[in-house]
A protein has these predicted regions:
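Acidic, metal/ion-coordinating pockets
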Residues: 1-282, 322-334, 344
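Feature captures C-terminal
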Residues: 3-5, 15, 28-30, 34, ...
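Generic preference for well-ordered secondary structure
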Residues: 87, 91, 156, 229, ...
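A short C-terminal boundary segment appended to hydrolase-like catalytic domains
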Residues: 262-360, 367
Length: 447
């Protein structure tokens, strides 16, 4: 009997160092350097193993913002990935946020194949690799890379104007027969998540096609040995029938691990499926060059941008969503001043800390880690009312206590989908889902 180990990280978002950079010289058990150390320590027990990145590696952290601001190149990020010797990866939706030339340059620099079978540029796959086969002893491992098809709903049109996005389900259905003919082991590497509960099959979200994981498992699990997922930042390690299912969280806080065993008759089975915690280790060190790079990054983050008239610190994010707060008022006011729009709304991310009086680059990036631009839209009153009522569904009230609705907590927290509104709007009762709005004039209004 022989074993093959598969180690997976996903949604690292450029968090290389063991810190989220909320403060200088902070240390946390996270990041690609420490996650890779965990992998290298564990893989010693196996003769054969794979190291996999499941996408969203190029954007979403202070380090990624630093690279685009200072050099316009991902070379320093690529250097980390190349020296860690990944075997293959796939594309995430955030890979497109800096534009197609930046992504293509990154792909040229990486020393491992990035697989994506369902995104096309003209008549060929964007990465020139959709499926790849690896020979491991007498076994052939076939891997297909897939990415959520929902990218056009988020991305700036000029970043993806030459691309076509296909359903991951449909492309997998197309490729599987050929993969079965050529491979003994089939691995699906999907930067997308699950639209239904894995046990009950009950939908956990509106079925838009953004996440097709459950549909693929339900239809094809008998042909898939390992089903790798991401995008939702969930931590999943379980079996769907005989298929190992992995989703290893985000920012390098956990590592997905699957071990397949092959018996003397070449029958393949799942030996184990688990998440390895990324924890501090006395043998883990950061070399001098990496420490120097981190210092440069910390200095850039501490650059003072401006001084405000008063403190806008957020001590409790939920309270800032329930009642007017100087930070969200400031942001919405700035949007209106810049755009000339009639109405503005913004969201608070989980990392939001507001602004101290002296605002640094660190403060800006901690509040909005993804450098997205605001959007100006023309909408009807009916659509605006519908959007406000959707925001109202964020809240639940029991015994006169306001809390967050379970719909925004399961299967993953979605606080970023609650919009905080500004200007003459409507005031919506938050007691029950489906409550309608009544006219309400208040420049500090909440939905």
């Amino acid at each position: 009997m022989s074993n093959i180990a598969f180690y997976v990280v996903s949604d690292v978002h450029g968090y290389i160092f063991p810190t989220d950079f909320t403060s200088r010289n902070q240390y946390q058990p996270m990041g690609l350097l420490l996650a890779n150390h965990v992998i290298e320590q564990d893989r010693r027990q196996y003769d054969q193993s794979f190291k996999i990145d499941n996408g969203d590696f190029l954007q979403g952290s202070p380090f990624c913002n630093y690279l685009i601001a200072h050099s316009g190149s991902s070379q320093l990020l690529v250097d980390f990935y190349n020296r860690m010797a990944f075997d293959f990866g796939t594309l995430g939706n955030h890979e497109f946020n800096y534009g197609l030339p930046y992504l293509k340059d990154t792909l040229r620099r990486l020393n491992y194949p990035v697989l994506c079978a369902n995104i096309y540029e003209n008549d060929s796959t964007l990465t020139d690799n959709g499926v790849k086969y690896f020979q491991v002893g007498d076994q052939t491992v076939g891997v297909i890379g897939l990415t959520t098809q929902f990218i056009p709903h988020w991305e700036q049109p000029e970043h993806i104007q030459s691309l076509t996005f296909h359903s991951a389900f449909e492309i997998l259905q197309q490729y599987l027969p050929e993969m079965k003919r050529h491979a003994d082991i089939i691995v699906v590497c999907y930067h997308g998540g699950f639209e239904k509960d894995l046990e009950s099959g009950t939908p956990t979200e509106v079925l838009t096609g953004e996440n097709e994981g459950y549909a693929m498992l339900e239809a094809f699990s008998k042909d898939i040995d390992i089903f790798i997922t991401g995008h939702q930042h969930r931590q999943i390690a379980e079996r769907f029938k005989q298929t190992a299912v992995i989703q290893p969280g985000t920012r390098g806080t956990t590592v997905g691990k699957v071990v397949l065993s092959t018996d003397e008759y070449e029958n393949v089975s799942v030996e184990s499926c688990e998440l390895l915690p990324v924890i501090d280790d006395s043998t883990f060190t950061i070399d001098e060059d990496d420490q120097h790079l981190r210092k440069q990054l910390e200095d850039w983050l501490d650059y003072e941008i401006t001084t405000l008239p008063y403190d806008m610190t957020i001590n409790h994010a939920f309270e800032a969503r329930v009642a007017p707060h100087p930070f969200t008022n400031f942001m919405n006011y700035a949007f209106l001043e810049k755009s000339g729009a009639d109405v503005a709304c913004t969201a608070l991310f989980d990392s939001a800390s507001g602004f101290k009086q002296v605002v640094t680059m660190r403060d800006v990036i901690n509040n909005y880690p993804f450098p997205n631009t605001f959007k100006v839209l023309a909408v009807s009153g009916a659509k605006l009312k519908e959007a406000i009522e959707r925001s109202a569904e964020y809240f639940d009230v029991k015994n006169d206590e306001v809390s967050v609705s379970a719909d925004f907590l399961e299967p993953k927290p979605q606080h970023f989908n609650y919009d905080i509104w500004w200007r003459k709007l409507y005031h919506s009762c938050w007691k029950t889902k489906g409550t309608t709005c009544e006219q309400y004039d208040d420049t500090r209004s909440r939905s």
